[in-house]
Each structure stands twice: as structure tokens, then as C-alpha cells.
Regions:
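Feature recognizes metal-dependent phosphohydrolase scaffolds
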Residues: 1-657
């Protein structure tokens, strides 16, 4: 066999890890065994909008997968009430365990029964994994015993006696609680191989910061950014406009816990400024939306701050629009179109009276200029966002594990839309002198979004990237937004409902056509019956009969209303998707009451399941992206074995096998 210099160099590098024929052959055999296993379960979620309790519950329950495993393993032999208790214990072991213990008359017997049930369940969920993989999932401090309990063979000894003796030792040495908790965590770990979050972790919900904590602790997760995410990414990067934008949303819902409690960002200077500047103003239009879960506090103070940051936001929007003509947002620099004496605005040729004409900080001769006090507030907030260690960790995680889109195991994941023309062609959007569409546009947006955080501080490239992050939040041709305009100004200042309409991109009309879904998949290099698009962003109005399944079953929108504000519009509380070795399962969820009720009353989210794609045969690891990489490694290892056997590369010292 002839070897190129490059191939030989690679094989020599590979030989450093696999130093003998035996070592390389053993790895080939190990990989071939892995490739024959069923593919792992993938879990898809989208549009979390800060609803951390519902998110954590669905994450812990794996959208009902764990309860299904419990019912399969324990069946009718265990009462439904006890199965529900066991499910809650697995979801929330640290919180549920003390409550269950307090109820027991014979704690020793309960420990024994619970550990046996958890062992059986854990053996079941680990059955589609190699023993080596399961071992890597076990906690170090008790991994050996867990491994023994999971992989013991009973051909020559009694199972009940073997388990019984080990469990007795665990209980005797006061380790039962620790082992129960570890088993619960391992079951959740093995039930789902990969988590996909298709955007919008941030928004109006009570604690988006707590949502980010969970993916950061997850073993394998990817995120496709939503427009609510990129504006927070821009804020963390140091964009004053993105900061004012996230503050506006936060204050509109009086959600100060996220900023002050979650990220340690003080709004004291802003509060003093707003109190002084708008002390005599009517701020009734600026009162926060009611949500009993967010801090009550002084609503008038929140309203004043809401108005203060909105005016600063409008000024900064005008500045960004002026220095980015290719955003094509001319006319949306509204402060430049207001007649302050008359109290009207020229809105694209129509003159409207303003619902609020009070602009004490605006200079009519230079409406976009911040006052000296506003400059100080903006600078302090930029510094506070930059110095929030927790926020920076969260945003760095979003950049490291997130992207504009992802292709995984034949599926295409993105949050918003592929911009289209009225006739269904990919719309060509021009930035920096070049028109791009489809995948090329997505790749460009991904690069510009990273530029806003990673380019050198103070550089023109970083400023341009931060401006682009704001454009991705609300731009008319932003693939993450997908509407004609974000009508924040119109809803606050103009009474005419016609001015408040946000027209959806033609994409949302064309995705009903199977040819559109297939066209998008081909654009990203995907094809075949098993390839699907997983999309979010636009809540599906299930209450009106709308289906989340579009494009002849090739596109699934899984934004069904995680956000509580959308429940009335959608009629449900969200969709999730499960992709296992049998196919794709859509889960439709009803509203979630609270974690407290789930823990103390064993209340689970009511859900229904629907297979939307059934694989013609069971999907194995060899059929996945990882399987493709493993098969490539087998080819390389086979070439290495041949190189050893032909004497092209010398074997190292044989290790004991």
C-alpha cells in the first residue's frame, strides 16, 4: 500500500496512542461493538423565555421519558401512587428524599425497596450503553459499588442475596441517602444522551439566569441562539444599546431579581436618575405588566426607570441606525421624526399624535444625543454588565456551546426563519457590500455575532459586531426575528393598531409546502426521509387548531408557549421533541403549576405524545454523526494495523491486554 507523506504523518501520530497491532485491533473491536448499539436519546426544547421552573421539570423528567421507563420496569406490580413518588424522587432527589423518609414507619425496609427499584431502573436505562460509557457516568466516590450493582451476573449466585448484602451494608453505614441520590442522577444522565435548546433562554420569565445553570451542568448540550439570547450576548459584550434593550424588557415586567439577585447588577444610579427626572411625569403608561412571581416593590419607581431606559434606548437606536446604513432601518430612528412642539411623529409619511409627549432629556436640535447624566448611567451599566462574573460565564457558555444553527444526526436546528421572498425563494440580504442568502447568510450571521464579543475591546470590529447583535434582535431581515419590525415604539407612543402590526416573513407562509422544507434541507446539505427541520420562535396556536408539524412532516415548530403570557394564545404550555432509536416523538405539554407542587404532591406535567416519524428500522449508533466519525477512525486504525504489519511503522512495546 502506498502512503502519502500527510497520511503517514497522521498514522505516526495515531501510533502514539495505539502502539501495537493488538492495541489498534482491540480499539477496532470496541468501536464495532459500540456501533451496533441503538442510538442515544436526544431531547429538544425551545423558547424557554426565563420560565426556569417549567424548564427544570421537563429537563428532569426528560419530557416524560423517565416516567415511561418507570412504568415499563415496574409495570402494574407497583401502585401508580408509588410510581409517581419514585418519579418525583428521581426528578428532585435532594428535595423529595427528606419528605419521603419522614413518612416511613420502617425506614430500613423503605431504603431497601427504593434502592432495589432504582437498581432495576438504572439497569434498564443503561442497557443501550456500553459498560465503559456507564462507568464514565458514575460518580467517583461510589462508582465501584454502583458498577457492581448494575453489571453483576447471577449465573452462579443468588441475585436477591447478592443485592441484599450490598444494600444492607449501604444502609448499615448510613450511606443510603447518598446512593439513592447518585442513582437518581445516573438515571437522568443515561436517559438522555444529548440536549438541544433551540433558542430564547432569556426573556420576561422570572429567572433566565437559573435556566443557564442547568445546561452548564449538562453532560452534552448545544444551543441555537434566539433573538432574546443575542441581545443579552450583546449586553454582556458591552453594547449600551443592547443593555438598554434588556433593561427595558426587565423593567416592563418588573423582573429585577434576574439583574440584581441573579447577576449582581445594581440599578441604584438609574433609579435615582429616573426618580429625579420623571418625578412630576405621568408614568401610568410605563407601569410593569402584572406577574405575581416577580418582585412587587415600588411599581411607580419601576415605571420611571422603565421610561428612562426606553428613552435612552431610542436615542441609542438612532445612533446605531445612523452608523449602519446597510441595516436598512432608516425611518425607525423615531426621535429624529418627532415634532416635539406639536407632540406628533412622522411615521413613514403619516403624522400621528404621541400618547406620551414628555421628553425632558431630549434636545430637539440633537434628539439622539445622551445627556451627561445618561452617559454616566450608560457607562456604569456597561461596566456592571462586564464585571458580572455570573453573566459573563453564562454568555461565554452560550458562545462556546451555541451557534446560529446546527446540523445533528440528519436534522437541521435553528431558532427563527430562513428569510424568503414572496415567491418562496431565499431572500438575498446585503451586508458589507455582499448579498447573502440561505446557509451563507446563516454562516455570516454566526461570524458577526461572535465578532461582537471576541474582537479586541474598543476596536471598530467589536463595535460593529455589537451593533449587529442588536440587528439580529430586531432587524427586519434578521433570521432570528423574522418580522417586518419590532413595534416597541408604536405600542408605547401610537394609538393606531395598524401601526403596531408586525408582518411575518414569507417564510412562515411557505413552510406549509413540503417543497420548501426540502429546499431548506438541501441548502444545508441534508436529504432523506429521516431529515427534519426543528424550529422555534413563533408560538403555535394549538387552541385554534394550528399544527406544529409543517412541510408535510419535514418541519416541526416546537414553540408552543413555555412563556406563561402565551398560554392563553396557544392553549398549551409548550412542545418538546424526543428523538430516540425508533424515531421522532412530539410531546405536547399542559401548563406546569410549580416545582413546589411537583415535589410535595407528585404532580407531573400532563403531556401527550405523537410519533411524527417512525424509522423503517431501529437507528443504531453507526447511523449517527458520531457513528460516522467512529467508522472513519476504524478505517484509520485498519490502515495503522496494515502499516505495522508491513513494517512501514514500527510497533511500540506491547502492553498487557
Amino acid at each position: 500500500m502506498q502512503y502519502s507523506d500527510e497520511h503517514l504523518r497522521y498514522l505516526r501520530l495515531l501510533s502514539q496512542k495505539y502502539q501495537t497491532v493488538a492495541a489498534a485491533a482491540s480499539e477496532i473491536i470496541r468501536i464495532e461493538a459500540l456501533l451496533r448499539l441503538p442510538k442515544g436519546t436526544e431531547h429538544f426544547m425551545s423558547d424557554l423565555h426565563g420560565e426556569h421552573e417549567a424548564f427544570v421539570h421537563i429537563l428532569n423528567s426528560a419530557s416524560g421519558v423517565i416516567r415511561e421507563k418507570i412504568d415499563t420496569v415496574l409495570g402494574n406490580g407497583v401502585p401508580a401512587e408509588e410510581r409517581a413518588e419514585l418519579a418525583t424522587l428521581i426528578y428532585y432527589p435532594n428535595q423529595k428524599l427528606p419528605e419521603l423518609k419522614a413518612r416511613q414507619r420502617d425506614l430500613h425496609a423503605w431504603y431497601r425497596m427504593t434502592l432495589l427499584r432504582l437498581i432495576d431502573l438504572c439497569r434498564f436505562v443503561s442497557s443501550k450503553h456500553t459498560r465503559d460509557h456507564v462507568r464514565r457516568c458514575l460518580p467517583q466516590n461510589c462508582g465501584y459499588i454502583l458498577d457492581e450493582l448494575l453489571h453483576a451476573h447471577f449465573e452462579d449466585h443468588d441475585k436477591d442475596q447478592y443485592y441484599g448484602e450490598i444494600i444492607e451494608s449501604i444502609i448499615r453505614y448510613d450511606r443510603a441517602d447518598a446512593y439513592i441520590i447518585r442513582f437518581c442522577e445516573v438515571i437522568k444522565r443515561l436517559a438522555v444522551d444529548r440536549l438541544h435548546i433551540v433558542g430564547d433562554l432569556f426573556d420576561r420569565g422570572p429567572r433566565p439566569d437559573r435556566i443557564l445553570d442547568s445546561p452548564m451542568a449538562h453532560h452534552q448540550v448545544d444551543i441555537q441562539w434566539g433573538n432574546h439570547d443575542v441581545v443579552w450576548m450583546g449586553a454582556a459584550a458591552g453594547s449600551p444599546l443592547c443593555i438598554m434593550t434588556v433593561l427595558k424588557t426587565t423593567l416592563a415586567y418588573n423582573n429585577l431579581d434576574t439583574l440584581e439577585g441573579g447577576y449582581g447588577i445594581s440599578l441604584r444610579r438609574l433609579e435615582r436618575f429616573a426618580q429625579h427626572t420623571y418625578a412630576d411625569s405621568d408614568v401610568s403608561r410605563w407601569l410593569p405588566h402584572a406577574d405575581q412571581r416577580t418582585a412587587a416593590g415600588d411599581l411607580t419607581a419601576a415605571a420611571r426607570m422603565h421610561k428612562a431606559v426606553t428613552v435612552m434606548m431610542l436615542k441609542l437606536e438612532a445612533q446605531v441606525i445612523a452608523r449602519n446604513p446597510d441595516f436598512d432601518l432608516q425611518g425607525r430612528d423615531f426621535l429624529n421624526h418627532i415634532d416635539f412642539a406639536a407632540g406628533t411623529v412622522d411615521y413613514f409619511g403619516t403624522t400621528y399624535p404621541l400618547l406620551d409627549c414628555d421628553f425632558p432629556t431630549v434636545d430637539p436640535a440633537n434628539p439622539a444625543a445622551l445627556t451627561a447624566d445618561e452617559e454616566k448611567i450608560a457607562a456604569e451599566l456597561v461596566r456592571s454588565f462586564a464585571e458580572s462574573e455570573r453573566l459573563q460565564r453564562h454568555v461565554q457558555f452560550l458562545y462556546a456551546h451555541g451557534a446560529f444553527y446546527k446540523m445533528c444526526n440528519g436534522n437541521l436546528l435553528y431558532h427563527g426563519a430562513v428569510p424568503m421572498t414572496e415567491d418562496g425563494a431565499f431572500a438575498a440580504i446585503r451586508f458589507e457590500g455582499t448579498a447573502r442568502s440561505g446557509k451563507q447568510l446563516f454562516d455570516y450571521c454566526d461570524r458577526r455575532a461572535r465578532q461582537g464579543y471576541s474582537a479586541p475591546a474598543g476596536s471598530p470590529a467589536r463595535l460593529a459586531g455589537q451593533d449587529f447583535l442588536w440587528y439580529l434582535w430586531c432587524g427586519a431581515k434578521s433570521p432570528l426575528f423574522g418580522r417586518s419590525a419590532m413595534t416597541t415604539f408604536e405600542r408605547l407612543y401610537i394609538a393606531d393598531p395598524a401601526a403596531q402590526v408586525e408582518i411575518k416573513d414569507p417564510y412562515y407562509r411557505h413552510i406549509a409546502d413540503p417543497r420548501t422544507a426540502e429546499h431548506i434541507l438541501r441548502e444545508f446539505g441534508l436529504s432523506g426521509e429521516g431529515s427534519h427541520i426543528v424550529n422555534g420562535h413563533v408560538p403555535v396556536r394549538a387552541i385554534e387548531g394550528e399544527s406544529p408539524i409543517k412541510g408535510g412532516g419535514r418541519l416541526i415548530i416546537i414553540d408552543g408557549g413555555f412563556c406563561r403570557a402565551y398560554h392563553r394564545r396557544t392553549g398549551i404550555a409548550g412542545y418538546t421533541l424526543v428523538y430516540n432509536s425508533r424515531g421522532l416523538i412530539l410531546r405536547t405539554h399542559q401548563p406546569f403549576e410549580s416545582v413546589d407542587k411537583a415535589i410535595h404532591e407528585d404532580e407531573d406535567i400532563a403531556s401527550k405524545s405523537e410519533y411524527i416519524y417512525t424509522a423503517p428500522q431501529r437507528i443504531l449508533v453507526r447511523d449517527t454523526d458520531e457513528g460516522g466519525r467512529k467508522q472513519a477512525l476504524i478505517r484509520d486504525l485498519t490502515a495503522l494495523v496494515e502499516a505495522y504489519q508491513s513494517g512501514v511503522i514500527a510497533q511500540g512495546v506491547a502492553q498487557e491486554m
